[in-house]
Amino acid sequence: YDMQPRFSPDGKRLLFTSDRGGSDNLWTLLLDGSDPRPVSADKEHVINTGDWSPDGDYVVGRKRLTDQSSIGTVELWLYHRMGGNGVQVTKKSEIPDANDPTFSPDGRWIYFAARDRRYQYNRNVYEGIWQIRGYDRKTGNFRPLTDGYGGSARPRVAPDGKQIAFIRRDRSHTLLMTHDLATGREHVVMDGLDHDMQENFAWTGTYSGYAWMPDGKSLVISYGGKIHRVEAANGTAHDIPFTVHVEQAVTQALRFPQNIAPENVRIRMLSWPQVSPDGSTLLFSTLGRLYKQPWPKGSPVVLANQGPRSYSPAFSVDGKHIAYVSWSDVNAGEVWVMNAGGGNGRRVTSSPGQYANPAFSKDGKKVTFLRGSGATERGRDLDEELWLDLMWAPVSGGEPQYVVTLGNRGAARRMPRLSWTPDGTRIFYFEDKGSGDDERTVLASIRPDGTDRQEHFKIKHGEEIMVSPDGRWAAFTRDFQGYLTALPVLGRDPVELSGESGPLPAYRFAQEGADWITWTADGKAITWSEGPIVHRVTLADIQNSWDKEKDEAGQKTDPAFKAKTPEEKKKEPPTVHPDTTEVRLLVPRAHPTGVVAFRGARIITEKGDEVISQGTIVVQDDKILAIGPEGSVTIPAGARVIDAAGKTIMPGMVDVHAHLHYNSLDIIPEAISPYYANLAYGVTTVHDPSASNYTAFSQSEMVSAGVTEGPRVFSTGYILYGAESPGRAEIQSLDDAKRHIRRMKRLGAFTVKSYMQPRRDQRQWVLAAARDESIMVVPEGGGNLEMNMSMILDGHTGIEHALPVTPIYKDVVTLFAKSHTGYTPTLLVAYGGLSGEHWFYQHDDVWKNEKLLRFVPRGWLDARSRRRAVMATDDDWHHMDVAAGAKKVMEAGGHVQLGAHGQLQGLGAHWELWGLTQGGMTPAEALRAATIMGAEYIGLDKWIGSLEAGKLADFVVLDANPLEDIHNSNTVRYVVKNGEVWNGDNMDRIWPSPRTRPLFPWESQGQMLEPLNMMGH
């Protein structure tokens, strides 16, 4: 993808940005297109927006630095035309974001636009986000040049060096202006440019590139879909007509049909898997139950008498007992011990709470565990614990003892897991210390009385760390890979490890996921899981492979406590030979039995433009048996008939970008309020393109199996993250990409989210690997139009999030429409300007919504809605312009689908739907985006998205017609999902048998603020 051309001072070559080397870098070529040469050749960073020095020897460009945030920061760097690594001009520590560099005609100054701090959403552009600065190449000093309201950006110096052209926001308009360098006087050249990128990430500049004509009397600039020459003195514009005939090769977008209605559900998300000390039994938790099966082969069976939900099982060292924790939304949880064969458990703890990760001492007399701060008692969710107390208790009974308080690692991370030293005098655990780039996962130990805390080692991006029973070794996970390392005994500052290189040896034994690492009781083997696959490898096997590696390197050593050479090895490590079993747990897919019919309603089928003015739908079990005009459909005898006269029926909404925020700390509640909120508002299918692997896939299986109620839940799981943070997906080759795709597929994903992998070749590797595994790729759009265009060319399933540039013209619209790549504009967080959700908060007293308050904690809703974070005039809302672009794509034959981004559960999907019409879509077009197009996008249209005989029974009964007024989508009377019928007002089930909605944890235990009577307020 080539862009941003600039003539060299002698007019013989073009400087441009190209990803032809795999990543955006600066290149030059002759005017006839020959002799392409790289100026920068950075393999780690994106470099673009170059400008020549007047002597033609140097080029200045912007280098994006990705850190713990994928947005990152930007520095300016200077490159010689012959190459080299470049010379730094600005530092991120001094200027967090530098952009739009350009030289003065004498070469002394580099002028650029600077943002005073890192990117922040919904900043007030009228206060001036960007201002122009100058860098003096003689003195090394910086000086500010502008301080204007509306910002100042995209500077271009006139040929005589006396004035600088720039762009500025004035109310809802973008102006072209000039700044006199001698007097500071500023002059408006013209009004009417396209919307600038000052409020966006500005990946390739704050406005399209433009230039002065050589005589300095006019400028060439683009707006309105055309190129113009604008006279600097008076703003008179002259069109520069051009025609381009384009023949563009586009890779077929990835899209694979899915079977979401099998007879049985394959359970893939095993948690806490471990093999009994005698090697005969595999123990694990899934679906909120404890299971065991013979190792290595056999069939799983449920251990009996465990209570409502059971998690976190652990064998005693002798294998005779199992410790585990329970959870009930009403009564909270406890720690229990039971015989390994099953039966009634004996409670170890004496106070209800959220417990996790019990571990027996070697003598079996004590058990240590974690206890939460009581989040649900305060009206919070399970993942919102303020802290976790490490405690222990006698197995025989007695008061639990407090040891130390640990931090909450967050719902995307594993809760600390615990173990004892052989003599029972210390407890090992891990926790995170530091923040930002200094964050490390630390292995520590402490005495049971809370004294003598020691730190043993630390690691960047560490996930789990488990110490061997003899205390000599530790197994840990980092970036989804498993390692073994020697455990030092130093009594001083902890050693920092770094994967396979560093001060201590570390051997990578698992490359495609290493969840729930556990040592066998004798310390001779390690177990871990990859979804339904459980591995066990002996320490001897690892050491033999380690020795083999040393032999091949010509440095045979005893691996214990001997450091490796510091060089990073690019070759694959020798293969260990784990024992492996694939747990094949199949449970029946839940669905009701019987027949229910809705009669007399207007039916929007989404089968083309079909609307049945007065029709009947008959549902048998979980599928539509018949549908058609009233009188043409026979209702079977004995069916439950619901009178829907005067109502409107439409397919259930499909939210393809639904962040459910259903996170937990490994312990999953019985009733999940975001699920009920979405169902209550008619969202019957959700697809979350960024979520905790464990939580998302576990709960998806729970819903399918009928253990938990909710919409159909699908997810990418955790993103394939390109930033430098825990959980990143490092992709430096096609093989790396294949490992990540296989890892996610094993967990149950049929989509993955490629998230801000900075280089195009990295994104292409993900696509190639996904195509081989029949996986769809829904990438983070990132507010980068040029990257989005290359994503379309390369065959991504869709673009998640808005194209930040508005308006979009025929070139972009045509490429989108003809590529079959889907567009999810997420208007509530529309990139490039004000987020759409604030428009709805501004125009709706959301805190008074009594229905919403049944599913959302009032305190949370008050905090979001009672004091508006943003107030703006109606002509200043960017999401409407984004919606207008989506309308163009749909009109041209493209696919647009609804994604509400989880900004407000349930009601937010309707806001997103209504936002589509604010850009010009008709109600019928918006409803298609919310139903059948969303289903088609992720390969579900065989089963859902339209109302046809044989499809799954997912639909909504409305009191009013949304084709007449789109706001009538929020008049939900009944919700039907998978054949079950609920009251849309309170989510009490109506059919096949009445059932009152259960209380949520924050209702049943917490100090919930009751919805107030808002009359008169």
Segment roles from a protein language model:
Residues 1-4, 9, 15-27, 36-47, ...:
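A flexible loop/linker signature enriched in serine peptidases of the S9 family
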Residues 609-650:
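Histidine-rich, glycine-flanked metal-binding segment
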Residues 739-758, 802-919, 985, 994-998, ...:
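Active-site neighborhoods of metal-dependent hydrolases
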